[in-house]
Amino acid sequence: MAQVPAVGSPFGAECREMWRVPKGYKQVGVDLSGIELRCLGHYLNDQEWMDELLKGDIHWFNAQSFGLVEKGTTKDDNNPEHKKARNTTKTLTYGVLYGAGAAKAGSIVGGNSSKGKKLIDSFINNTPGLSALKKKISRLMAKGHLPALDGRRVWVRSEHAALNTLLQSAGAIIAKQWLIESTKLLQEKEIDAKLLAFVHDETQWEVREDQAEEAARLIEQAATKAGEALKFRCPVNAEGKVGDNWKQTH
């Protein structure tokens, strides 16, 4: 399921239109909003960073942390260089969080590993709490594992992959708790719903047509409840769509 191409990819729309619901029902798709960066926000535990994530423009904030634009620069939406810096930052941010090394980071901006190292070092040093988090992870790695969001042990193959593993595990735990909370709310309200797919940070449901909009709102509410249940420091939100097939609901 996770390998089905996205709507914008070749044959993606046609593939996703094949997942549909019977007459009298609607398909409800709900996605967690920016869960990877919210997981980072939880572990950074820095109010300034979380405010930028939730109320500001975290990618512009990170562009300054990487040194792609000067600190304190006000974003101009009509400036093509600002737009380019912001788009590059999105790629860099997720690349670094997913374990990209200096060579990969450098290639993203058309440079070499030396340039990539400067970018990564700048991001670590200018992101509030990130340097301290990485040092804490290094200390914990002496045991060969990290404590996950819910207390379980997460075994890590190398220190290079430690931050990524910690964030991925947190996202997976949040998503599973979200599914539990969604099921509870749907059952409490006696919603006629069946789970069709649970893919990464997305759920797809078959819901009786007259209950579809209510189901979408309940599943969105369940995301917040999941974060609260796990004492997640960064609010968890979700966005739902109602349609007739997977193309329309994701």
Language model features with spans:
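A glycine-rich phosphate-binding loop feature that marks nucleotide/adenosyl-phosphate handling sites
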Residues: 58, 110, 121-124, 136-145, ...
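Acidic, glycine-rich two-metal-ion catalytic cores of nucleic acid-processing enzymes
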Residues: 1-78, 85, 137-202, 217-226
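Generic beta-strand/beta-sheet core signal
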Residues: 30-33, 95, 108, 168, ...
